[in-house]
């Protein structure tokens, strides 16, 4: 769901922040 849609978006932002 919906959680499956929100969580990847958060992970992308988090990963972008951490791996920059």
From Swiss-Prot:
<keyword id="KW-0963">Cytoplasm</keyword>
<dbReference type="GO" id="GO:0003677">
    <property type="term" value="F:DNA binding"/>
</dbReference>
<keyword id="KW-0597">Phosphoprotein</keyword>
<dbReference type="GO" id="GO:0005634">
    <property type="term" value="C:nucleus"/>
</dbReference>
<keyword id="KW-0539">Nucleus</keyword>
<protein>
    <recommendedName>
        <fullName>Implantin</fullName>
    </recommendedName>
</protein>
<dbReference type="GO" id="GO:0005737">
    <property type="term" value="C:cytoplasm"/>
</dbReference>
<comment type="similarity">
    <text>Belongs to the EF-1-beta/EF-1-delta family.</text>
</comment>
<comment type="function">
    <text>Binds DNA.</text>
</comment>
<keyword id="KW-0238">DNA-binding</keyword>
């Amino acid at each position: 769901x919906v959680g499956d849609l929100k969580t990847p978006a958060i992970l992308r932002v988090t990963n972008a922040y951490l791996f920059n």
